[in-house]
């Protein structure tokens, strides 16, 4: 019998620090990394590159099923590779975001991408970053982590990120946007944002990223008997 590669799922709301934690875990353990939040954007960009009709579910399904995408952590930064090309910046454009929203509306496209995400589960293991990784995509994962933080702290972090990039931002507006997104994510009909019953819940509100990584790594090593 072939052993199934282990998975560490990291779910949680936007701005809790999932991306940073997952990149650190992938680099330390030498495992594969899946950024599920970027998958639809990568599909949208592939559709644009290959001139696939974004309104056609029939045309998008095979593209989704065979999507050539990799996530490569490099010294604290994540490179998103589509067909061997780094598209980390390109997938963040408004045009790609709008196209991604249209693609996500098709049930068969979602199903194809679900199977594509599960295909990332290869040896020696996978770190899966998302919102329903531990509850839906990899519900049998041996290690599940739910990373949370207060809406105020997540808004503060986001404000600092944007200010570092030279943007002028309003804290109250950011906080309102985060609270609205939280409400949508936690109350949606399909796969609402919630910790898996067997997940370790980490509240990073008052923790440094080093503390979060240390706690998550020690927990994972204990469960997986990694020294």
From Swiss-Prot:
Key word ATP-binding present: yes
Listed InterPro entries: Cytidylate_kin, Cytidylate_kinase_dom, P-loop_NTPase
A GO CC term assigned to this protein in UniProt: cytosol
tRNA processing as UniProt keyword: no
One of the GO biological process terms: nucleobase-containing small molecule interconversion
Main location: cytoplasm
Keywords from the named record: ATP-binding, Cytoplasm, Kinase, Nucleotide-binding, Transferase
Listed name of the protein: Cytidylate kinase
Record-listed ATP binding positions: 12-20
Entry's localization field: Cytoplasm
Any Pfam family the entry gives: Cytidylate_kin
Entry superkingdom: Bacteria
Enzyme Commission designation: 2.7.4.25
Gene Ontology molecular function terms on file: ATP binding; CMP kinase activity; dCMP kinase activity
Family note: Belongs to the cytidylate kinase family. Type 1 subfamily.
SUPFAM superfamilies registered for this protein in UniProt: P-loop containing nucleoside triphosphate hydrolases
Catalytic activity: CMP + ATP = CDP + ADP; dCMP + ATP = dCDP + ADP
């Amino acid at each position: 019998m072939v052993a199934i590669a282990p998975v560490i799922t990291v779910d949680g709301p936007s701005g809790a620090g999932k991306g940073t934690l997952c990149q650190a875990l992938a680099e330390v353990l030498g495992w594969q990394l899946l950024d599920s939040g970027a998958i639809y954007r990568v599909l949208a960009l592939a559709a644009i590159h290959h001139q696939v009709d974004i309104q056609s579910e029939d045309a998008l399904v095979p593209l989704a099923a065979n999507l050539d995408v990799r996530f490569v952590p490099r010294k604290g930064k994540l490179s998103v590779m589509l067909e061997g090309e780094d598209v980390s910046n390109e997938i963040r454009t408004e045009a790609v975001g709008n196209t991604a929203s249209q693609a996500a509306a098709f049930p068969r496209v979602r199903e194809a991408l679900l199977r594509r995400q599960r295909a990332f589960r290869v040896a020696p293991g996978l770190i899966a970053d998302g919102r329903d990784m531990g509850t839906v995509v990899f519900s049998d994962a041996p290690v599940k982590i739910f990373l949370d933080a207060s809406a105020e702290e997540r808004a503060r972090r986001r404000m600092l990120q944007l200010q570092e990039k030279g943007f002028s931002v309003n804290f109250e507006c950011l906080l309102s946007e985060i609270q609205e997104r939280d409400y949508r994510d936690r109350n949606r009909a399909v796969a609402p944002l919630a910790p898996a019953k067997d997940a370790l819940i980490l509240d990073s509100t008052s923790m440094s990223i080093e503390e979060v990584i240390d706690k998550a790594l020690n927990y994972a090593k204990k469960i997986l008997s990694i020294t």
